[in-house]
A protein has these predicted regions:
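Conserved helicase motor core of P-loop NTPases
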Residues: 1-116
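C-terminal accessory regions
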Residues: 95, 99-208
Length: 208
């Protein structure tokens, strides 16, 4: 069951999100009319599938090769499940990242800039506060009991709707790809943003 999070102060926006949550197709045109068209390079992109996220990530790494990317592999002591807390292989460089989990000095959806790498962890500067912190790998227990260790972050270029849950953004791109295929996916994607004017629709929404 989807529960409303009151991150929107714009009542019209909140009311239309509520209708969208319950499958009202007539509100789709309202979002097309009131959200921005195109793409913002300053915003993260929410996608319906891992495949589309992978396309965005590969393009970002290729276009920004000068950020000196390297691949950081997860460590685990058993078999992996379909649902992982963060990706098994993360490409990171001297670039902007987003946290995917809550920690003592950061929370899910926070952005930061990577400053340096060391054996002790990754030094980042938090975007909102300017504070410099060191981030270590986190360890999770998967549903099958496997211990899974990885950095709790991703490149700040694209994430799936699933990974975006619980996040709040001032600005976001939404790429529907071939369509949001699960009930409530579009609602979750649209409701991550505080205002409709912070939403950039890569493609116009379609009624299904």
């Amino acid at each position: 069951m989807l529960h409303q999070v009151h991150r929107q102060e714009d009542k019209r926006f909140a009311d239309h999100l509520e209708l969208l949550k319950y499958g009202c197709k007539s509100v789709v045109q309202w979002f097309n009319d009131n959200c921005c068209r195109g793409f913002s390079y300053d915003a993260i992109t929410i996608c319906p599938t891992n495949e589309l996220v992978k396309e965005y990530t590969e393009r970002y790494v290729k276009e920004n090769w000068h950020y000196c990317f390297d691949t950081y592999e997860a460590e685990y002591d058993g078999s992996l499940t379909d649902e992982l807390p963060v990706e098994q292989n993360i490409q990171l460089g001297l670039c902007r990242i987003m946290f995917l989990w809550n920690g003592k000095q950061y929370k899910r959806g926070d952005f930061a800039m990577i400053e340096s790498f060391s054996d002790d962890g990754i030094d980042v500067t938090m975007e909102k506060t300017g504070e410099r912190i060191q981030v270590q790998r986190e360890t999770w227990t998967l549903t099958n009991g496997t211990k899974y260790t990885q950095y709790p972050m991703c490149l700040a270029c694209a994430i799936t709707v699933h990974k975006a849950q619980g996040c709040t953004f001032d600005e976001v791109n939404i790429d529907r790809g071939n369509g949001f295929w699960m009930p409530g996916q579009l609602y979750v994607a649209m409701s991550r943003c505080r205002t409709p004017y912070g939403i950039h629709l890569v493609k116009p929404l379609k009624e299904k």
